[in-house]
């Protein structure tokens, strides 16, 4: 249960660099565990020197206290025995930070009848036992909402359920036996809503091994839009624990209020009635083949094309031309929505992402430490408040920044703005009108995105060679 995925759980001696419990020394494995746990579930971004060498360990203490508070432990700020024991417990793989009973933005299914498919099976249990466990897990949520579920045997369902080991194609590899048991994604298109179970676990229907019904009930709560709860009585509490009454799970009031805030109560006399809070209108989800579609930013990332719009982005890969649709927060939780510009400086294997007067550096699915920074650190004058578009030209190792009717050129090698800039866009890119939304450099051409149109520009001939719809990259 993680939030680009949702996962079910889950050095040399460290002297004064890390808070210790009494005179106990933490061994390498304990420190590795603590570091990985805080990074994975509490968004801790360590600095090697600070983490292992500085005596001022307040950032570490705060993260330990944050973990202790969420999981209901005594807030000592130290790696005491109770804290280390909790870190060893199997749990959901979704991070605990966020403070939402539902996911940010409250994603939900826009219908009450939801399909699911069990794609493959664990060898630990008979197929019919797996079928029954999943059906009962969904029934837990069905009993307190208007939702109904139906299973299909082929094709794509709203919720695709599968068993896998290690790296399985979603940036959230499983870790073998223990700790992260499973993960699921919040509602949405593509792999959103799907639930993955670590097949390295020993799945069971009783107290031995890992109880599939209990884990599935938790994970499918994520598939319906619920986040983690810090209530130990809640089914959505992230740490796994077997209940002897597992055949008759009773949702906590926290669980009921969370799911009913998304879908309402079950329309029957025996349903638990909970007032449904008013919900602010959510931003519309962009439609890829909308003829009026425009993009906020466009870039490449390690050979893939990324097209950003509001809270979402499309991802088109070389091996799968059908674009995937994702929430920005699912890959980069700390990035804002409604981006202004993005470009890949692939000589540095990173993407710079801009919004307002700030920018972030991203490598893979990690936002780099030390960001955001102010755009003026790149050499812009104080009069520049935001960037409209940016693009990197690999052959020249130059980045072009477009602002209004002008553009700047940045030397990536020297990390300085080139002299003689800004210049008018129309002087050097004839046929391209000011106020560019996004720019992409690919196949020897510049592609300028302006509203719902894009212009293919040949830099050698200094002319526009084609005019296309912006979303033609999305097979529209």
From Swiss-Prot:
Active site (record annotation): 219
Annotated binding of Zn(2+) 1, by residue: 168, 170, 183, 196
Binding positions (Zn(2+) 2): 218, 222, 228
A biological process from GO: collagen catabolic process
Main location: secreted
Example of a GO MF term: metalloendopeptidase activity
Keywords: Calcium, Collagen degradation, Disulfide bond, Extracellular matrix, Hydrolase, Metal-binding, Metalloprotease, Protease, Repeat, Secreted, Signal, Zinc, Zymogen
Propeptide: 18-99
Signal peptide segment: 1-17
Subcellular location per the Swiss-Prot or TrEMBL entry: Secreted, Extracellular space, Extracellular matrix
SUPFAM superfamilies: Hemopexin-like domain, Metalloproteases ('zincins'), catalytic domain, PGBD-like
Motif (Cysteine switch): 90-97
InterPro entries associated with the record: Hemopexin-like_dom, Hemopexin-like_dom_sf, Hemopexin-like_repeat, Hemopexin_CS, M10A_MMP, MetalloPept_cat_dom_sf, Pept_M10_metallopeptidase, Pept_M10A
Binding site for Zn(2+): 92
SS bond partners: 289-476
EC number: 3.4.24.22
Catalytic activity annotation: Similar to stromelysin 1, but action on collagen types III, IV and V is weak
Domain notes: The conserved cysteine present in the cysteine-switch motif binds the catalytic zinc ion, thus inhibiting the enzyme. The dissociation of the cysteine from the zinc ion upon the activation-peptide release activates the enzyme.
The protein's role, per its UniProt record: Can degrade fibronectin, gelatins of type I, III, IV, and V; weakly collagens III, IV, and V. Activates procollagenase.
Protein name: Stromelysin-2
Organism: Rattus norvegicus
Gene name in the database record: Mmp10
């Amino acid at each position: 249960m993680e939030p680009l995925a949702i996962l079910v759980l889950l050095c040399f001696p460290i002297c004064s660099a890390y808070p210790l419990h009494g005179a106990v020394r933490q061994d390498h494995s304990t420190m590795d565990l603590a570091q990985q746990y805080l990074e994975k579930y509490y968004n801790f971004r360590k600095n090697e020197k600070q983490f292992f060498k500085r005596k001022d360990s307040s950032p570490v203490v705060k993260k330990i206290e944050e973990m202790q508070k969420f999981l209901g432990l005594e807030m000592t700020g130290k790696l005491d025995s109770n804290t280390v024991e909790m870190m060893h417990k199997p749990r959901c793989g979704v991070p605990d930070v966020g403070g939402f009973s539902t996911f940010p933005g409250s994603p939900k299914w826009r219908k009450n009848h939801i399909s699911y498919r069990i794609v493959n099976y664990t060898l630990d249990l008979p197929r019919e036992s797996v079928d029954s466990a999943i059906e009962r897990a969904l029934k837990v949520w069905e009993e307190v909402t208007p939702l109904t579920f139906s299973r299909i045997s082929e094709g794509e369902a709203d919720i695709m359920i599968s068993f896998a080991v290690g790296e399985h194609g979603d940036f959230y590899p499983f870790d073998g036996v223990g700790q992260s048991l499973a993960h699921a994604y919040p509602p949405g298109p593509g792999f959103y809503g799907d639930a993955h179970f670590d097949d390295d676990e020993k799945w069971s229907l009783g107290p031995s091994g890992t109880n599939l019904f209990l884990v599935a009930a938790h994970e499918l709560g994520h598939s319906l839009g619920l986040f983690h709860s810090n209530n130990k009585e809640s089914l959505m509490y992230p740490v796994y624990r077997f209940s002897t009454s597992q055949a008759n799970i009773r949702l906590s009031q926290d669980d009921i209020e969370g799911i009913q805030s998304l879908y309402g109560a079950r329309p029957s006399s025996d349903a638990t009635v909970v007032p449904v809070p008013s919900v602010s209108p959510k931003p519309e989800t962009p439609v890829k083949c909308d003829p009026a579609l425009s993009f906020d930013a466009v870039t490449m990332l390690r050979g893939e094309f990324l097209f950003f719009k509001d809270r979402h982005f499309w991802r088109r890969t070389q091996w799968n031309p059908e674009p995937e649709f994702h929430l920005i927060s699912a890959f980069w939780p700390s990035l804002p929505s409604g981006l202004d510009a993005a470009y890949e400086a692939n000589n540095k294997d990173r993407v710079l992402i801009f919004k307002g007067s700030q920018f972030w550096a991203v490598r893979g699915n990690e936002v780099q430490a030390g960001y955001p920074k102010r755009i003026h650190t790149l050499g812009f004058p104080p009069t520049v408040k935001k960037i409209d578009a940016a693009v990197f030209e690999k052959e020249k190792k130059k980045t072009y920044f477009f602002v209004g009717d002008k553009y700047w050129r940045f030397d990536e090698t020297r990390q300085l703005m080139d002299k003689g800039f800004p210049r008018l866009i129309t002087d050097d890119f004839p046929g391209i009108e000011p106020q560019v939304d996004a720019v992409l450099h690919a196949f020897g051409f510049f592609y300028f995105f302006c509203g719902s149109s894009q212009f293919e520009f040949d830099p050698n001939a200094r002319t526009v060679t084609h005019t296309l719809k912006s979303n033609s990259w999305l097979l529209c």
